[in-house]
Design a protein with these regions (language model features):
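Beta-rich catalytic cores
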Residues: 21, 28-29, 81, 88-89, ...
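Asp/Glu-rich intrinsically disordered low-complexity tracts
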Residues: 37-38, 56, 62, 66-69, ...
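Acidic glycine-/aspartate-rich tracts in secreted/extracellular proteins
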Residues: 37-40, 46-49, 77, 97-100, ...
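Trp- and S/T/G-rich repeat-edge/linker motifs of beta-rich repeat architectures
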Residues: 5-19, 73, 77-79, 128, ...
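Short glycine/serine- and acidic-residue-enriched loop/turn motifs that recur at repeat junctions
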Residues: 1-8, 13, 45-67, 105-127, ...
Length: 227
């Protein structure tokens, strides 16, 4: 994930592209991803679950000649670019220029949001236009996303929050421990909003291993999950 087989105790430059610069980075468990200034995404590191998004399970960045311009761009779909990215232990999500979200990698708790437990990004023809948008509900787009260890959350365009994936310790914020996103009929309009309190809206979201926090529009923070 540092693009070398060596362990570094001081910072080293990661060569991602000769023509584009990175504008943000995100680190998952065994992998990392960068959002470039043209809206494209590149990922490297461990790839057992397809979390790099290249349609295989091949690690990248651990051998000579795998980084810089040799590192592929993640296929997000026809003319789609990313505005932000979030990486977790075994999956990655991108918030796209149209406000929709795509996720790939491990999906054992439905953390990708596709109403099943099938990994995405670890097989051929699973990325690009074949990778569906996460159904956030009728008419809703996202403005912020966060990926926890095995769950994902989004702040929607109305300031409300939705979360899906593992919920063993209440990290989804629904007052129960029921996983969501791993079965049919659990996403879209069926997925509830997190109750942030009367009149409260979120402006950004952050997810940890087993908990989640939201920054509210009044500058206060609310957190839920394992404590």
């Amino acid at each position: 994930q540092m693009s070398s087989q060596s362990t570094f105790q001081t910072p080293k430059i990661v060569r991602i592209s000769t023509s584009q610069k990175a504008v943000s980075v995100t680190c998952g468990g065994p992998h990392a991803c960068a959002l470039l200034d043209n809206g494209s995404v590149k990922c490297w590191g461990g790839n057992n679950d397809g979390q790099l998004g290249y349609g295989d399970t091949i690690q990248r960045g651990d051998d000579a000649g795998e980084m810089d311009d040799a590192l592929p761009i993640v296929e997000l779909g026809n003319e789609r670019t990313a505005v932000s990215i979030a990486a977790s232990e075994y999956h990655t999500c991108a918030l796209l220029d149209n406000g929709f979200v795509k996720c790939w990698g491990g999906n054992n708790f439905g953390q990708l949001g596709y109403e099943d437990k099938n990994n995405r990004g670890d097989g051929v023809e699973e990325m690009g236009d074949a990778l569906l948008f996460v159904d956030l509900g009728t008419g809703h787009t996202a403005v912020s996303i966060a990926a926890g260890s095995l769950h994902t959350c989004a702040v929607l365009d109305n300031g409300f929050v939705k979360c899906w994936g593992r919920n063993t310790w209440g990290g989804l914020g629904y007052g129960d421990t029921i996983h969501r996103g791993d079965g049919a009929g659990e996403m879209g309009d069926a997925l509830p909003f997190v109750d942030l309190g009367t009149g409260h809206e979120a402006v950004s979201i952050a997810a940890g291993d087993l908990h989640t926090c939201a920054l509210l529009d009044d500058g206060f923070v609310k957190c839920w999950g394992l404590n």
